[in-house]
């Protein structure tokens, strides 16, 4: 069996790569000449990396597409190619190695600790989330938050997104904690602020709860379910919250529901109408965008810049 001798964080320009990696995602892309290639996101315990599968010169676009469709995200595959820096990002390029993507490697012979990227201290996140819930004075609202989270399988394991931010095991819980702490901080920072802190906290704690139902565990990772795009996590989260409305003042419950439905801000179907809803929207964006920017700059050298794959903006490191 091929041993795990190369890790994502060790891949650098011009090196030969031949090692097992988790394939997090496989997307079919079109080349300028009308041909096809596969954009892979690969990972292991050290993080995520990019990989482009070009195939061989005699392969048709249909054959490349067939390989892409057969790849099972979350499984371990042999990645055989060479590294190259393109637009500031180090990528693995695969030609003949496309044959290695026909089937995943058997997981039984691998140590999961070498392949699972899980930077979150979940015990610490649980403790701090509990502290945020404890700040809610209204017992009905506190019970609502606890009941929804406790009845949501995968809340502490699921990622917060497929790629752009907190895209790792425990990412949803970590992002929820960050957004809640930021929202609470905003409520106490702006002068002459009058916000319903209980409603603000509940809305922040539950704003992304629907994402837990949008992913399922596969192999060494999580993959997005059709519900992720067909229904959307906001609607799924709202449905979960509505099942636990008993015991909460109707007006305050409606406000919590508004925060959840409006947390995408001016680009969402429901626009924020209250200071609490705007605070959660800004907190959500701050957590997501800062995580993306931090990840995009993590491997930059001083005075180096590139287009960040996650934040989709040019990033620079001083």
Give the positions of each predicted feature.
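Acidic/His-rich, divalent-metal-binding segments that scaffold phosphate/diphosphate chemistry
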Residues: 105-228, 266
């Amino acid at each position: 069996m091929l041993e795990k001798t190369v890790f994502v964080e060790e891949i650098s320009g011009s090196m030969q790569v031949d090692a097992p990696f988790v394939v997090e995602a496989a997307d079919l892309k079109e080349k300028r000449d009308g041909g096809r290639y596969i954009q892979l996101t690969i990972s292991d315990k050290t993080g995520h990396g990019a990989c482009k599968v070009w195939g061989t010169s005699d392969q048709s676009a249909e054959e490349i597409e067939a390989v892409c469709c057969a790849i099972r995200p979350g499984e371990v595959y042999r990645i055989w190619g060479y590294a190259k820096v393109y637009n500031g990002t180090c990528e693995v390029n695969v030609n003949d190695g496309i044959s290695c993507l026909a089937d995943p490697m058997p997981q039984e012979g691998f140590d999961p600790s070498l392949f699972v990227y899980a930077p979150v201290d979940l015990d610490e996140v649980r403790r701090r989330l509990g502290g945020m819930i404890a700040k809610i004075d209204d017992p009905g609202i506190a019970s609502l938050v606890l009941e929804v989270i406790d009845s949501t399988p995968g809340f502490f394991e699921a990622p917060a997104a497929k790629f752009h931010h907190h895209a790792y095991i425990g990412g949803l819980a970590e992002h929820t904690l960050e957004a809640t702490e930021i929202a609470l901080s905003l409520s106490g920072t702006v002068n002459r602020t009058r916000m319903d802190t209980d409603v603000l906290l509940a809305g922040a704690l539950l704003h992304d709860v629907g994402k837990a139902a949008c992913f399922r565990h596969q192999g060494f990772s999580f993959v997005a379910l059709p519900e992720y795009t067909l229904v959307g996590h906001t609607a799924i989260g709202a449905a979960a919250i509505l099942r636990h409305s008993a015991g909460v003042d109707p007006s305050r419950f409606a406000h919590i529901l508004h925060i959840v439905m409006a947390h995408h801000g001016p680009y969402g179907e429901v626009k924020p109408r209250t200071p609490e809803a705007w605070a959660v929207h800004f907190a959500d964006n701050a957590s997501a965008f800062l995580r993306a920017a931090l990840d995009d700059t993590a491997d930059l050298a001083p005075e180096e810049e590139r287009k960040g794959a996650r934040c989709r903006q040019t990033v620079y490191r001083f």
